[in-house]
Amino acid sequence: MSVITRFAPSPTGFLHIGSARTALFNWLYAKHTGGKMLLRIEDTDRERSTETALKAIIDGLHWMGLSYDGDPISQFERAERHRQVAKQLVKDGKAYYCYASPEELAEMRENARAEGRPPRYDGRWRDRDISEAPKGVKPVIRIKAPQDGETVLHDRVQGDVRFPNKDLDDFIILRSDGSPTYMHAVVVDDHDMGVTHIIRGDDHLTNAARQTIIFNALGWDIPVMAHIPLIHGENGAKLSKRHGALGVDAYRIMGYLPAALRNYLVRLGWSHGDDELMSIESMIFWFDIDDINKSAARFDLKKLDAINGHYIRMNNDQDLFDAVLNILPEIEGGLEIIERLDEQRRAQFLAAIPNLKERSKTLRELIDNASFIFTKRPLLLDEKAQILLDKNGQAILNGLYLALKACLSWDAKTLDETLRVYAQKQDLKFGDVAQPLRAALTGRVTSPGVFDVLVLLGRDEALNRITDQLVTTAC
């Protein structure tokens, strides 16, 4: 049997980080088994479904490198097929028309509330003849659910999960306006698409029990089910925006790499020994749904940062630069940076990446660490840099300016010798000389090596930046 999985998002918002992990697990299992992953858009909620959300989902999948087989399938466009199956169930005696009025249903709910039990439809139209139907009332179609015993879900992650049938009631599969319910449409679509394995969040467990009833009523094979644990925040509570519940696109703009996000997400609920970092080829080779944990995974942003930092360090410099250029239009101040990145500064930025990426956990940090390249003159000094350029620092800087200006060659070796000779003559430690210089060149106390910065900026720009600070202080 060829494995067919499916990712079935609703186009009502962005590709949530939890949905991205579900897509990843489906994709990995399909690749691991040599099967396919299909994309179904569950767009039956016409009021909330938008083209913008659909585009965000597809773009998010593409950015993460999660390809799907064939064209996306619209659930809404299959509504006629859903209606046909529902009506066939009525003909087969597996479902029935229900004419209960809104008032009757409200009374059932009120009685259940008064008796302290969950609201359940009482089945009053289950065995009544259609000739008793009131005039002018459009019926719904309800499934004839088993009234005794239990429905058992054989789940590859959760094990056997049992649901008393008395708690499931005769739920609606077709509304009075002829539109299918989610519960019914999913079953028909999974069957028609040939889905063999359903991998989704464990918040769908009760849905799975009801869908099992529909599968059985239709005499269709039930796909293998694997309900994966949800992702919780670091505090163990439901994932919130504060603790990482953002869309994939938000993580892209925050400067995370798709390979890093894949690597992090695959470890949320699944593992392979002590392996933290793994290639996509290793993930595909190792991944199996039987190894998914039952307990909820906790989202740890610091761990994601650490993994992303690893991928940044391992990445090709040009690819990192291209990724930076890709997100610049979407970050605060990014358009200004683009305007300042002329050909020379682009070359300087690219040349600085080997050093900068060693200290950057995200692309945003990489941009920030490179800001000394494209910042406006005179540089605004941060608080620590201002302290370094006090009167004593200014005196050191003034002497350094003269020493550097006299350099016949502007290379790291010559500059190193110049600074060390100057420090020795002034009876200063090398750090006492390098720190004020770094502050004047970058506006900060941390940066790539001071010689790297001097060479990167070039003689004229470096000397001009030193002059800026001397003039600024003198004023």
UniProtKB/Swiss-Prot annotation:
GO molecular function, one term: tRNA binding
Reactions catalysed, as given in the entry: tRNA(Glu) + L-glutamate + ATP = L-glutamyl-tRNA(Glu) + AMP + diphosphate
Residue ranges of the motif 'HIGH' region: 9-19
Motif ('KMSKS' region): 238-242
Xref: InterPro entries: aa-tRNA-synth_I_cd-bd (IPR045462), aa-tRNA-synth_I_codon-bd_sub2 (IPR020751), aa_tRNA-synth_I_cd-bd_sf (IPR008925), Glu-tRNA-ligase_bac/mito (IPR004527), Glu/Gln-tRNA-synth (IPR000924), Glu/Gln-tRNA-synth_Ib_cat-dom (IPR020058), GluQ/Sye (IPR049940), GluRS_core (IPR033910)
Superkingdom of the organism of origin: Bacteria
Keyword flag Lipid biosynthesis: no
Entry binding sites for ATP: K241
GO CC terms: cytosol
GO process annotations (BP): glutamyl-tRNA aminoacylation
ATP-binding is among the record's keywords: yes
Intracellular or extracellular location(s): Cytoplasm
EC number: 6.1.1.17
Keywords (A to Z) from UniProt: Aminoacyl-tRNA synthetase, ATP-binding, Cytoplasm, Ligase, Nucleotide-binding, Protein biosynthesis
Subunit details: Monomer.
Function: Catalyzes the attachment of glutamate to tRNA(Glu) in a two-step reaction: glutamate is first activated by ATP to form Glu-AMP and then transferred to the acceptor end of tRNA(Glu).
Similarity annotation: Belongs to the class-I aminoacyl-tRNA synthetase family. Glutamate--tRNA ligase type 1 subfamily.
Designated name of the protein: Glutamate--tRNA ligase 2
